[in-house]
C-alpha cells in the first residue's frame, strides 16, 4: 500500500518522461539557434549547428561573437585580399568584352540600312522577342546551375557570381543592340535583286571575312571561370607573399604565415636549441680546461708538499744533531762535576783526619799544636 501511494503523482500535475523532456529540450535549442542564425555569405554552419567563418577558416563560439570576428584584423585583411583579387580578375575581362560588339556595330553601320527600313520594322519585334527569350532562358539556366553547384563552393565566391551575372546582363543588352542591327542587314539582303542571290549561291557568304564566327554562348554554372579566378588569386597571393617585407603585419604569426616563413615560436625554439647546443659545447670545452687546470694544480700541490717534507726532514736532522751535541756537553759537565766532588770529598776526608789527630793529642803537652 505504501509503495502504491508513493508511486502516485499529486493531482493536477503531468508526468513527463525523460525521452520527451530530451525531445522538448532539443526542439527548444533548435528554435533558439534558428532564431539567432546569422545571414552572411561568410558564415557557415556544420551539421552540428556550429558557426564558423568560411573566409578565415576559424570557428566562432557563438553568434554574439560574430560581429567582433568580422571587425577583427584577420577577417578584414582576408576581405581586402579577396577584393584586390576581384579587381585584378575583372580588369582584363572588362577591357576585352566590348571589342566584338564594336566590330559588329561598325560592320553593320557601314552597310546601307536605309533601303531596308520597311522590312526591318516587320522583322524587328520577332527577333527582339526571340533574343529576349534566349537571354531569359540562359539566365535561368545559369541561375539553376549556379544554385546547384554553389552548395559545394565556398561562400566567399557568391559575390563573384553576382558580378558575373551583372556582366552577362550587360553583354546580353549589347547583343540585343547588335541583334537589332543584324535584321537590318537581313532585310536589306532580302530586298536586293536576284543576281545578288545567284552570286551568293556561287560564292560563300563572307569569303574575305577575317573574323571567324564565334561559338554560341552556353550557359554553365561558372565553375571553370571560378577555378581560373581561384588560380589567379592563389598566384597573386603567392606574389604578394614574396613581395611583402618582414614585419608588414603587426601580428608576427600572421606575418610569418603570409610570407611562408617559420612562425616566431618555431624560430625561437630553433634558436633555443642552437643556443643549448652551443652552451653544451662551451661547457664541455670549459670542463676540459678546468680538468687540465685541476691536474696541473694537483701536480703543483704535490711538488710543494714534497718540498715542504724535505725541508721538515732537514730541520729534524738539524734538531737531532743539536740534541746529540747538547747531550755530549751535558755528559762532559757531569763527569767534571763528579770529579770535582770526588776531589772535594778527598780533601774533606784529609782535613777531618788531621782534626781528629789534633784532637786526639794532649794539648797540654808542650809543642803539641805546632
From Swiss-Prot:
SMART domains: ZnF_U1. A zinc finger (C2H2-type) spans 53-75. The modification N-acetylalanine is found at residue 2. Residues 16-40, 310-338 form a coiled coil. GO terms for molecular function: nucleic acid binding; zinc ion binding. Residues 90-99, 121-134, 196-212 have a biased composition (Polar residues). Residues 1-21, 75-220 are annotated as: Disordered. It is found in: Nucleus; Chromosome; Nucleus speckle. Residues 104-115, 172-191 have a biased composition (Basic and acidic residues). It holds the Pfam family ZNF380_CC. The keyword Zinc-finger applies. Keywords: Acetylation, Cell cycle, Cell division, Chromosome, Coiled coil, Developmental protein, Metal-binding, Mitosis, mRNA processing, mRNA splicing, Nucleus, Phosphoprotein, Spliceosome, Zinc, Zinc-finger. Phosphorylated in response to DNA damage by the cell cycle checkpoint kinases ATR/ATM. One of its GO terms (cellular component) is chromosome. May play a role in pre-mRNA splicing as component of the spliceosome. Acts as an important regulator of the cell cycle that participates in the maintenance of genome integrity. During cell cycle progression in embryonic fibroblast, prevents replication fork collapse, double-strand break formation and cell cycle checkpoint activation. Controls mitotic cell cycle progression and cell survival in rapidly proliferating intestinal epithelium and embryonic stem cells. During the embryo preimplantation, controls different aspects of M phase. Component of the XAB2 complex, a multimeric protein complex composed of XAB2, PRPF19, AQR, ZNF830, ISY1, and PPIE; this complex binds preferentially to RNA. Interacts with XAB2. Identified in a pentameric intron-binding (IB) complex composed of AQR, XAB2, ISY1, ZNF830 and PPIE that is incorporated into the spliceosome as a preassembled complex. The IB complex does not contain PRPF19. This is Zinc finger protein 830. It comes from Rattus norvegicus. The gene is Znf830.
Amino acid at each position: 500500500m505504501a509503495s502504491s501511494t508513493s508511486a502516485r503523482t499529486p493531482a493536477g500535475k503531468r508526468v513527463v518522461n525523460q525521452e520527451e523532456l530530451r525531445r522538448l529540450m532539443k526542439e527548444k535549442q533548435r528554435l533558439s539557434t534558428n532564431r539567432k542564425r546569422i545571414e552572411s555569405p561568410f558564415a557557415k554552419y556544420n551539421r552540428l549547428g556550429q558557426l564558423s567563418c568560411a573566409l578565415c577558416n576559424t570557428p566562432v563560439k557563438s553568434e554574439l561573437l560574430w560581429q567582433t570576428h568580422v571587425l577583427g584584423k584577420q577577417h578584414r585583411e582576408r576581405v581586402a585580399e579577396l577584393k584586390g583579387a576581384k579587381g585584378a580578375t575583372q580588369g582584363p575581362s572588362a577591357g576585352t568584352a566590348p571589342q566584338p560588339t564594336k566590330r559588329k556595330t561598325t560592320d553593320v553601320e557601314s552597310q546601307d540600312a536605309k533601303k531596308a527600313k520597311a522590312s526591318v520594322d516587320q522583322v524587328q519585334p520577332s527577333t527582339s522577342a526571340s533574343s529576349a527569350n534566349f537571354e531569359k532562358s540562359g539566365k535561368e539556366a545559369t541561375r539553376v546551375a549556379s544554385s546547384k553547384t554553389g552548395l559545394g563552393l565556398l561562400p566567399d565566391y557568391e559575390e563573384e557570381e553576382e558580378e558575373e551575372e551583372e556582366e552577362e546582363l550587360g553583354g546580353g543588352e549589347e547583343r540585343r543592340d547588335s541583334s537589332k542591327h543584324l535584321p537590318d542587314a537581313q532585310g536589306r539582303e532580302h530586298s536586293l535583286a536576284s543576281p545578288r542571290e545567284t552570286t551568293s549561291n556561287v560564292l560563300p557568304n563572307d569569303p574575305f571575312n577575317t573574323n571567324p564566327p564565334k561559338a554560341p554562348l552556353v550557359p554553365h554554372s561558372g565553375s571553370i571561370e571560378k577555378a581560373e579566378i581561384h588560380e589567379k588569386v592563389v598566384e597573386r597571393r603567392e606574389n604578394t607573399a614574396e613581395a611583402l617585407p618582414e614585419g608588414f603585419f603587426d601580428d608576427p604569426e600572421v606575418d610569418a604565415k603570409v610570407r611562408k616563413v617559420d612562425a616566431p615560436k618555431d624560430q625561437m625554439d630553433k634558436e633555443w636549441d642552437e643556443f643549448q647546443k652551443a652552451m653544451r659545447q662551451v661547457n664541455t670545452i670549459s670542463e676540459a680546461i678546468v680538468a687540465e687546470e685541476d691536474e696541473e694544480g694537483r701536480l703543483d700541490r704535490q711538488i710543494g708538499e714534497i718540498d715542504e717534507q724535505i725541508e721538515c726532514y732537514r730541520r729534524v736532522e738539524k734538531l737531532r744533531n743539536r740534541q746529540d751535541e747538547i747531550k755530549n756537553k751535558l755528559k762532559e759537565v757531569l763527569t767534571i762535576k763528579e770529579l770535582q766532588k770526588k776531589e772535594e770529598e778527598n780533601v774533606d776526608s784529609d782535613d777531618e783526619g788531621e782534626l781528629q789527630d789534633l784532637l786526639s793529642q794532649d794539648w797540654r803537652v808542650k809543642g803539641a799544636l805546632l
